[in-house]
């Protein structure tokens, strides 16, 4: 057996975070147990868990402090409430049948325990570490989380200490608001008026990028830290370099023109994926986007069917969205140019995943009100809006 579990519990400086391994004495966990007990490290000295002095639990459990212990006050928090809490959690796990009683002499546990240097309340240290250890053991032996849970939750989750959410596009449809006005003061003011929504994307439009460069992404992020920000560079050359520039500026997606050489598009997509951002292919003025897609080594994450500002008054169809999705089934399809409120149902019915709207929102007398109308037209609830959340 070689099982791994993790759990976080509590709040404030007494917060407990436990990572543990449980496995056979003769296996890798047993080897780690023996190494930890015999190879001491200053500030991270391992110790056996005990319910009280002279009463260790079964399976035998080794505690390793995560945070460097610098003085005896800090040591007392480990050699005391945390040591006892971990041991009692192990014993109770056996009593409750989580750990099979007939295997306690065959197994060992190695638990890495976090104790904040400023933790003071021994009662909370005990209770939080007891709960976290017990939960980590249960999760380890149940194989929690399974891969389906990981994939479902990974796009919803925000790390509590990180303090901001990294948005991914997994729950379409979305409203992408394009800011082409090169007046930065106006753009930032308008962005601050946009309602917070899991289904809103912010686009730094081409004129804005041309005037301020990719540094404008950081300016936008100061106003909307959690936003998914698209940098509309309409790249035509040096695809890998421009993708890296957007990634370095903390953007979420870069736009490449479908008119660019195939090698440029390929390099941009490759670099975007390497750096963890999305690659968007804009089909503006490209008469045969299907042909372009068929020549690519890897599909872009988003394919934008686009007519330009200068031709929005002409008769237009967004093209065969269904055919594009057959060629690139995992890609999202965005529609841009002439998207107004009365066109939203049509675009969605044709299979559009992203509606790109510019002046219909950004030039409105009431930006917030108009944005709300578009958001409501998506008819999409917020992610986990009705979920009562603890850890899961």
From Swiss-Prot:
Pfam families: Fae, OMPdecase. The lineage of its organism: Archaea, Methanobacteriati, Methanobacteriota, Stenosarchaea group, Methanomicrobia. GO terms for biological process: 'de novo' pyrimidine nucleobase biosynthetic process; carbohydrate biosynthetic process; L-ascorbic acid catabolic process. This is Bifunctional enzyme Fae/Hps. It catalyses: 5,6,7,8-tetrahydromethanopterin + formaldehyde = 5,10-methylenetetrahydromethanopterin + H2O; D-ribulose 5-phosphate + formaldehyde = D-arabino-hex-3-ulose 6-phosphate. The keyword Lyase applies. Catalyzes the condensation of formaldehyde with tetrahydromethanopterin (H(4)MPT) to 5,10-methylenetetrahydromethanopterin. Catalyzes the reversible formation of ribulose-5-phosphate and formaldehyde from 3-hexulose-6-phosphate. Residues 1-161 are annotated as: Formaldehyde-activating enzyme. InterPro entries: Aldolase_TIM (IPR013785), Fae/Hps (IPR020868), HCHO-activating_enzyme (IPR014826), HCHO-activating_enzyme_sf (IPR037075), HPS/KGPDC (IPR041710), OMPdeCOase_dom (IPR001754), Ribosomal_Su5_D2-typ_SF (IPR020568), RibuloseP-bd_barrel (IPR011060). Substrate binds at residues 19, 48, 66, 68, 83. One of its GO terms (molecular function) is hydro-lyase activity. The active site is at 17 (proton donor). Pathway: Carbohydrate biosynthesis; D-ribose 5-phosphate biosynthesis. Residues 162-392 are annotated as: 3-hexulose-6-phosphate synthase. Keywords: Carbohydrate metabolism, Lyase, Multifunctional enzyme. In the N-terminal section; belongs to the formaldehyde-activating enzyme family. In the C-terminal section; belongs to the HPS/KGPDC family. HPS subfamily. The keyword 4Fe-4S does not apply. Its EC number is 4.2.1.147, 4.1.2.43. It is an enzyme of class 4 (lyase).
